[in-house]
């Protein structure tokens, strides 16, 4: 199993690479690429950790050597948020980066499962899809927007609020991966109940958690460590699905035939072909139904922006 991380010298990329080096199955290959010249050194640094995962690093303008034979590609390249920016401010820089990297994936590893971490995910996934379509290699079951950070934040915040063991908390988060498009389905959590005020406050905190980190870091960065953990969880789930493990389910932003939008985050069953099945997200409360319907204009505009960028 070969996993490639593009943007591996960045804050998310280094955290993700460290976690993958320690958690990928034995005899996996980990391939690190970044434009930054430090990248081969990141690989050497990681190679001193005693796990049966081979690490190689590649720097420069062309990621193709890192992508050869990749089964999974995780793309975290791009600029990070700074105070006062929202995820859409990142679009102008990150859109071109994602387009160029996905073009290389299409040419070098067209069958790989591609996880897009680079924000704004609502838009960059649509860009990736259009690039893959133009290359004639688009498979909707092999492209994912990584929204796992919204899931782990939801699970953490709910466990804190209710005094639960976080390992026992599972939360589906649907919609997209920015602001109002992030919708945790708190009504579905077994064994807990929330007041209307708690639901509103928790939902808002989950939606704005990225900003919470950006402001707390006082201009020194964004959510890199928690995002690295979230991306590792999702990447390992992709690997487990490819290896034939049963019942691997994660939420992700996919082209899954949703009635709501061309791309929509919801639970998916992972397998040897990527998405084996898009799962129904189940019954929702009145608050959740209203929030879902209210987000759709924003979400569809984000998607349209990505489609038009490529065309």
Curated annotation (Swiss-Prot):
Q: Which Pfam families match?
A: Ldh_1_C (PF02866), Ldh_1_N (PF00056)
Going by the UniProt record, its keywords in alphabetical order are: NAD, Oxidoreductase, Tricarboxylic acid cycle
Q: Which SUPFAM superfamilies match?
A: LDH C-terminal domain-like, NAD(P)-binding Rossmann-fold domains
The organism's place on the tree of life at top rank: Bacteria
Can you name a GO cellular component term? cytoplasm
Q: Which GO terms describe its molecular function?
A: L-malate dehydrogenase (NAD+) activity
In terms of InterPro entries, this protein maps to: L-lactate/malate_DH, Lactate/malate_DH_C, Lactate/malate_DH_N, Lactate_DH/Glyco_Ohase_4_C, Malate_DH_AS, Malate_DH_type1, Malate_DH_type1_bac, NAD(P)-bd_dom_sf
Residues annotated as binding substrate: 81, 87, 119, 153
- So what does this thing catalyse? (S)-malate + NAD(+) = oxaloacetate + NADH + H(+)
Report the EC number(s), separated by commas if there are several. Answer: 1.1.1.37
Classification via PROSITE patterns? MDH (PS00068)
Q: Where is NAD(+) annotated to bind? A: 7-13, 34, 94, 117-119, 227
Entry annotation: catalytic residues:
177
* Function according to Swiss-Prot or TrEMBL: Catalyzes the reversible oxidation of malate to oxaloacetate.
Q: Which family does it belong to?
A: Belongs to the LDH/MDH superfamily. MDH type 1 family.
Subunit structure as annotated in this protein's UniProt entry: Homodimer.
Query: What's the name of the protein?
Result: Malate dehydrogenase
Q: Which organism encodes this protein?
A: Shewanella woodyi (strain ATCC 51908 / MS32)
């Amino acid at each position: 199993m070969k996993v490639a991380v593009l943007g591996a010298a960045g804050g998310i990329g280094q955290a993700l690479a460290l976690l993958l080096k320690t958690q990928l199955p034995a005899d996996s290959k980990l391939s690190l690429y970044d434009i930054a010249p430090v990248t081969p050194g990141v690989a050497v640094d990681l190679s001193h950790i005693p796990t049966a995962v081979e690490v190689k690093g590649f720097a420069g303008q062309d990621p193709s050597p890192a992508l050869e034979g990749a089964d999974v590609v995780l793309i975290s390249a791009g600029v990070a948020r700074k105070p006062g920016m929202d995820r859409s401010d990142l679009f102008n820089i990150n859109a071109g980066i994602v387009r160029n990297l996905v073009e290389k994936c299409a040419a070098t590893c067209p069958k790989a499962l591609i996880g897009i971490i680079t924000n704004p995910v609502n838009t960059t996934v649509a860009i990736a899809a259009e690039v893959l379509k133009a290359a004639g290699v688009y498979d909707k079951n092999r492209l994912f927007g990584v929204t796992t950070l919204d899931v782990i934040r939801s699970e953490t915040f709910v466990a804190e609020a209710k005094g639960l063991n976080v390992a026992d908390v599972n939360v589906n988060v649907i919609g997209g991966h920015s602001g109002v498009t992030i919708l945790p389905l708190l009504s579905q959590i077994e064994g807990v109940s929330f007041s209307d005020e708690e639901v509103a406050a928790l939902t808002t905190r989950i939606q704005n958690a990225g900003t919470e980190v950006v402001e707390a870091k006082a201009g020194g960065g964004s959510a890199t460590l928690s995002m690295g953990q979230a991306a590792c969880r999702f990447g390992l789930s992709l690997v487990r699905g490819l290896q034939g493990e049963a019942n691997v389910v994660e939420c992700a932003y996919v082209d899954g035939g949703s009635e709501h939008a061309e791309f929509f985050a919801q639970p998916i069953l992972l397998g040897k072909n990527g998405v084996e099945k898009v799962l129904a997200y189940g019954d929702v409360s009145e608050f959740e139904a209203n929030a879902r319907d209210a987000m759709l204009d924003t979400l569809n505009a984000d998607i349209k922006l990505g489609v038009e960028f490529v065309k």
